[in-house]
Amino acid sequence: MVEFRAYQEEARYFKYAFNAAGKVVEEAPLIVTENGIVSRAMDASHIAMAVLEMPWEMFDEYEPPSDELMYGLDMEEVTRIVRRARVTDEITLEGEDEEEVIIKLGSSGYEREFRLRSIDIDDIPDEPELDFAVEVTVVPDFIQDAVRDADLVSDTVKVGAKGNTFYFKAEGERGRVIPKVQEGAEALLTFEVEEDVETAYPLDYLKDMIQAAQGAESVRIRLGQDMPLELTFRIGPAGEGKLTFYLAPRVEE
């Protein structure tokens, strides 16, 4: 018996969001309620956390369950499936008795159905509540380019704000890279800075996280001195949903 059904005519939003989350966490719960679908999970090393929120408004059709449901997902398997989505594909998520999640991809009458057995999830973390000194919103291209540029010279990147400038900074034996954007630039949609900040983060995680930018409308970045980095990718036709990552700072000796 189908317990819930969620349909969206553009599978690309889910393709990029699940692909990015699946690179960061190995297992994740899928919590389904009358308000939509939520997932929260930590990576095995507890360096990063992924929070996916898909309210019912994000879907073209949403049939909620009568009671809250929870499925456990092997994110590697989910990633393999959503990568198969074509540009023109629609996507449907369904669940049966908290035992199976069904993912349907297709268009124009051609449909592929994938079934995933629910796995046991031991712990569902709470989303942290943090007070950040810096909050900016950028176009997705900026953070993609900044992370890829930093990766040319180092495995660590410093993210910071000083005056009216928000920047990434990476240094290594091969050189130095400083992608930056100033208040008022088209790439910087919002800019709120209480104090100057600069904190280092591991690039290997960031390279995985920015995969979500391909399907995002915008990216909110929040940070503080020696605090976790928060990245929020707005997803969906009008940015109704969001994928948020938290990344612990890199302790420098």
UniProtKB/Swiss-Prot annotation:
Q: Name one Pfam family in it.
A: PCNA_N
User: Which InterPro entries does UniProt cross-reference here?
Assistant: DNA_clamp_sf (IPR046938), Pr_cel_nuc_antig (IPR000730), Pr_cel_nuc_antig_C (IPR022649), Pr_cel_nuc_antig_CS (IPR022659), Pr_cel_nuc_antig_N (IPR022648)
Question: Per the record's keyword annotation, is NAD included, yes or no?
Answer: no
Top-level taxon of origin: Archaea
Q: Name one GO biological process term.
A: leading strand elongation
Keyword list (alphabetical) reads: DNA replication, DNA-binding
Q: Which residues cross the membrane?
A: none
Enumerate the GO terms in the molecular function aspect.
DNA binding; DNA polymerase processivity factor activity
To which protein family does this belong?
A: Belongs to the PCNA family.
Under NCBIfam families, the record lists: pcna
Cited function: Sliding clamp subunit that acts as a moving platform for DNA processing. Responsible for tethering the catalytic subunit of DNA polymerase and other proteins to DNA during high-speed replication.
SUBUNIT field? Homotrimer. The subunits circularize to form a toroid; DNA passes through its center. Replication factor C (RFC) is required to load the toroid on the DNA.
PANTHER family in the record: PROLIFERATING CELL NUCLEAR ANTIGEN
Protein name in UniProt: DNA polymerase sliding clamp
Organism, by scientific name, is Methanopyrus kandleri (strain AV19 / DSM 6324 / JCM 9639 / NBRC 100938)
